[in-house]
């Protein structure tokens, strides 16, 4: 990052990426978030609305909009630097009373949501309310060392209750490895199922996605071959498309449990 000479502004944030992928896959997404009263916040709101995302749960705050700087490497991989801001101030009073009405799945990401503070409290209350209503819960740990430090143990401890509450868990190969302390997706998923996880999708880059259900079903679904330019948001696009198709398939909560 310190060698960078050019910066290109892009709308992002994992939950917003997922919401956009849901809409582009034929679903309907609504988002709870908080942005600043600044040009970046205005840009994000405009982009969300252009994607057709329901934004009644997106509010403004005096704190500047959270920024993520992504440094691209030659192989398409990234390094991240974060400037936390308004996203951490999302409070329960910002969530519309009807936010969970006519909703099939509630998706949570952990990049900043589990760091603590007001956003963390709101996350917990929203999860509790979604479970009370019997809604399907999806969770993506979305580990970023720049937010949690290089020792993932605190991150794992924060994520574990969410893993156990989720019906669908999406992880990368790297996340699965350090969460379970094993190297293979087969054994890693088995450990998660033994701990109570229902359905796990492991994104494996160009090789595809390893899907595993605790009833014993495991399968590698190949990816469509592409030339990798920038992998930022690839996992978000995947889980967004998956969630849209799950709703469209009409699968019930009992199936995922």
Question: What is each of the regions a protein language model found here?
Answer:
Residues 15-24, 123-129:
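Histidine-anchored nucleotide/phosphate-binding helix
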Residues 128-129, 181-257:
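Conserved phosphate-binding/catalytic region of the ribokinase-like
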Residues 28-112:
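Conserved N-terminal subdomain of the carbohydrate kinase-like
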Residues 105, 111-191, 197, 207-208:
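Conserved beta-alpha-beta core of the PfkB/ribokinase-like small-molecule kinase fold
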Residues 10, 17-28, 72, 245-247:
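Alpha-helix C-terminal capping segments
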């Amino acid at each position: 990052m310190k060698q960078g000479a050019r910066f290109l502004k892009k709308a992002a944030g994992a939950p917003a990426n997922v919401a956009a992928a849901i809409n582009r896959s034929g679903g309907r997404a609504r988002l709870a978030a908080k942005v600043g009263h600044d040009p970046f916040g205005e840009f994000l709101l405009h982009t969300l609305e252009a994607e057709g995302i329901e934004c009644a749960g997106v509010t403004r705050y005096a704190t500047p909009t959270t920024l993520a700087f992504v440094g691209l490497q030659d192989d398409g991989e990234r390094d991240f630097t974060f400037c936390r801001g308004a996203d951490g101030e999302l409070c329960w009073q910002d969530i519309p009373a009807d936010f969970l009405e006519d909703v099939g799945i509630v998706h949570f990401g952990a990049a900043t949501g589990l760091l603590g503070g007001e956003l963390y409290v709101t996350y917990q209350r929203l999860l509790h309310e979604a479970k009370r209503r019997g809604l399907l819960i999806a969770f993506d740990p979305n580990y970023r060392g720049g937010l949690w430090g290089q020792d993932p143990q605190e991150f794992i401890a924060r994520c574990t209750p969410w893993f156990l509450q989720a019906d669908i868990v999406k992880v990368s190969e790297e996340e699965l490895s350090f969460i379970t302390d094993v190297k293979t997706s087969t054994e890693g998923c088995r450990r998660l199922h033994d701990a109570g996880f229902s359905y796990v999708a492991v994104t494996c880059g160009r090789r595809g996605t390893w899907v595993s259900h605790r009833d014993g079903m495991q399968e590698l679904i190949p990816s469509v071959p592409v030339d990798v330019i920038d992998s930022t948001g690839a996992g978000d696009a995947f889980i967004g498309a998956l969630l849209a198709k799950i709703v469209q398939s009409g699968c019930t909560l009992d199936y995922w449990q």
